Each structure stands twice: as C-alpha cells, then as structure tokens.
A protein has these predicted regions:
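Histidine/lysine/aspartate-rich catalytic loop segments that bind and position anionic ligands
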Residues: 125-144, 152-154
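A short alpha/beta connector and helix-capping loop motif
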Residues: 109-134, 188-190
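Structural motif
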Residues: 22, 97-102, 128-130, 188-192
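Conserved thiamine diphosphate
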Residues: 93-96, 142-175, 227-238
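Glycine-rich beta-alpha junction loops
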Residues: 27-28, 32, 134-135, 168, ...
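Short acidic, glycine/serine/threonine-rich loops at helix termini
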Residues: 33-35, 62, 111-113, 139-143, ...
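Cofactor-binding active-site loop characterized by glycine-rich and histidine/acidic residues
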Residues: 1-121, 146
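Glycine/aspartate-rich loop-and-adjacent alpha/beta segment that forms the canonical ThDP
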Residues: 169-251
C-alpha cells in the first residue's frame, strides 16, 4: 500500500487529496507504524517506544500519530467509517479512495455487513476492503466459531471480489491496481494468509495468537527463521550484527 498504491504526503499528513487508510484490525498496529515511519511520517527511532508507557505508539493504532486517520481496536468499526468517507468523497467531487484492512474474524460483526450493503447500494467504487483471511480469531479458528465462505458472502453483497495469496506482494499489488475496473462496485481483496508465516513452530497454531516468544530458544529460533525470509541487503535495525545463534529446542 505505502510503496505502490496509496496517495499521501508525509510532510503534510492532513493533505485533503490523500487516500484514506484505516487499519480496522487495530491490534496489528506495529506493521502500520513501521510502514509510516519508513515513509517519513515520524522518526524511525521512535519505533523502539512501541507499547512503552507514555508512548503515542500504542498497541492499537491511534489517530494521535501522524499518518493514522482513525483510532481502531474495537472490531467492526473500520469498514463503516471507510464507507462514510468514500461516500463523502463522491458527494464532494473528491478523487481520493478509501482503503480498509480487516480481519476475517472481524467479519462476524453485523456492522461489517450493514456497511457492505450500504457501499453496494451507493456504488462506492472508490472503496477497497482488504480481508486478512488467516482463519483465526481471538482464541479459536474461525470455522469453529462461524463457518463462512468468505468470497461468496462478499459476492452476495454485490462486491467485486478478488482473491490473492496475501504473502505475494506482486499479487497484492496487481489486485489493488485492478480495483479501478470494478464496474461501479466496491472491491474486496481477500488475502489468504498463514498466521505466523515463516516461523515453523508458530504457523497456524492458535496458541500463538495471543502469545509472544520468551527469551531463549523461542525468541532466538523465531528471529533466525524470520531472517531467512528477509530480502538480501535489507538491514534489520534491531539485530544489526546478525541474528542470535540457533539453539536446539530444550526437552
């Protein structure tokens, strides 16, 4: 989004012509903070204050941070707000688009489908939802809570549906660029993802939905495996001297 899709000006975060972006799954705020810091909204060094007492980089995204359009955390609110902003753009003759990233578990919220129906009725082709379809929510797998065919549900609400591998940047980029051909429909990009991707002992394990790795084997193994996914030449500011030595898992 921040490298190829969104229109924004980090020197003027409130620029009226910017595209609007809402991270509805606000608990994933660390990823957005990293992206906007790298794009000049604030100093990258401030990322080290994330979650610290008194830091503006709270666990859920806050509009007090430059580049954040809407505070989120209470699920089910992002799409309704993005829908309202898309309608406002249409009514005011503005060319900006509204983007919202949501979780698949979040799609259990009734407010999501009220907004989806509204967006279809008003032909909001300047609205793009991205659903992180990792099949997990809170403390269980999505299908154990409410089994839904995600693509068919959105199609039933009249949306233009695109499905992609959420770990493939080219597929994501192409899908988001294709939304301009949506025939006066809002677009949803369903990004199929793997929770804990790249870390062998975390992938698709519900245990890790609310856990963080402890010091020692868990942390060192996770960092080592993540480094294997890092593009060559990219420097990690948190481990500038390389990752810790891999350890054997304790018995």
């Amino acid at each position: 989004l921040y490298t190829d899709i969104l229109k924004f000006d980090s020197r003027n975060p409130e620029w009226d012509g910017r595209d609007r972006f809402i991270l509805s799954k606000g608990h994933a705020g660390a990823s957005v903070y990293a992206a906007i810091a790298e794009n000049g909204f604030f100093d990258v060094a401030e990322l080290k204050t994330h979650y610290a007492n008194g830091s503006r980089l709270s666990g859920h995204v806050s509009h007090h941070v430059p580049g954040i359009d809407f505070s989120t955390g209470s699920l089910g609110h992002g799409l309704p707000v993005a829908t309202g902003r898309a309608l406002a753009a249409k009514q005011n003759g503005k060319l900006y688009r509204s983007f919202v990233v949501m979780g698949d578990g979040e799609c259990n919220e009734g407010s999501v489908w009220e907004a989806a129906e509204f967006a279809n009725h008003y032909k909001l082709d300047n609205l793009v939802a991205i659903v992180d379809h990792n099949h997990m929510q809170s403390l269980d797998y999505c299908n154990n809570t409410l089994e839904v065919d995600m693509a068919k549900r959105w199609e039933g609400f009249g949306w233009n549906v695109i499905e992609v591998d959420g770990h493939n940047h080219d597929e994501l980029r192409n899908a988001l660029n294709d939304t301009s051909n949506s025939e006066h429909k809002p677009t949803v990009v369903i990004a199929h993802t793997v929770k804990g991707k790249g870390i062998s002992f975390m992938e698709m394990d519900i245990l890790w939905h609310y856990r963080f790795p402890h010091d020692g084997w868990e942390y060192n193994c996770a960092v080592n495996e993540l480094h294997k996914t890092k593009p060559e030449g990219v420097v990690d500011p948190y481990t500038p001297n390389g990752c810790p030595e891999k350890e054997e898992k304790p018995e």
